[in-house]
Amino acid sequence: MRMEESKMRILKSIFILLNVATIMIFLYSENRLTWFCGANAVLLYLLSCAIHLIAHESGHFLGGVISGYKLVCLRFGPISIICKNNRFILKWKFSLTGQCIMTPQHINPVRFKAYNSGGIWANALIAIFSFTLLLFNSFWTSLLFIEMVSIGISKILVNAIPHKTNGIPNDGYTLKLLKTSIAVQKDYATYLRLYGKLFFNEEISAKDYIYKREVSQNKDEMLYYNEIQDILSSLE
């Protein structure tokens, strides 16, 4: 597993280098390889990253809404939108990442595809819509187009290629895992509901989250079930 994580870190680094190389080549081809254009390219790069971050988490949110999930927390960098008792609360805490936490309904089969793939589809749509920037026939909009598309492709691949980062599965890994069996889907849904309770520091009755589970020889298929047991054990 550590080997796989190392490979993915290398792949992510390659994506970043390719993005930078693409931008540099464009600046050079336009005879704009200057400190001024370079500085603005960095600003547009950060803007593109922010847009794709917002799009990715919003994609998860929309996928969750379509699937009947209930919002717990939607975070865009330092801004968090928390939904508690049908009331929205804004919180600010420094962060450069995003997160969308939602809890599913008590229905079978568990609806998970739209929620987990929503972020990837959102990044793809943003990358496609970025082609409209070429209509302006401007150096700066062309530069923004290149950055939006290159970052979008990187985001899609990083989230779609199944892998774990520090033991945490990405979207592609989660989708692959949930397709294996109904038991894993039940574990996943139960884990999200339990995590939602934990997020709000609400009282948790262990008996509501204890159920019979056939042990799988595949450790990954037991991932969410084991997470549930770890949380319940920590509450004792």
In which residue ranges do the predicted regions lie?
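Topogenic membrane-insertion module of multi-pass membrane proteins
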Residues: M1-Y45
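Membrane-embedded alpha-helical segments that form the functional core of polytopic membrane enzymes
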Residues: T34-A55, S142-L157
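Small-residue-rich helix-interface/hinge motifs
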Residues: L43-Q105
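Hydrophobic transmembrane alpha-helical segments that form the core helix bundle
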Residues: Q105-L198
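Generic helix N-cap/helix-start motif at coil->alpha-helix transitions
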Residues: K186-A189, D220-I228
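"A position-specific structural signal for the A-helix of alpha-solenoid helical repeats
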Residues: L192, I228-Q229, S233
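Helix-turn-helix repeat elements of alpha-solenoid scaffolds
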Residues: K197-K212, E236
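Solenoid-like repeat scaffolds
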Residues: Y211-E221
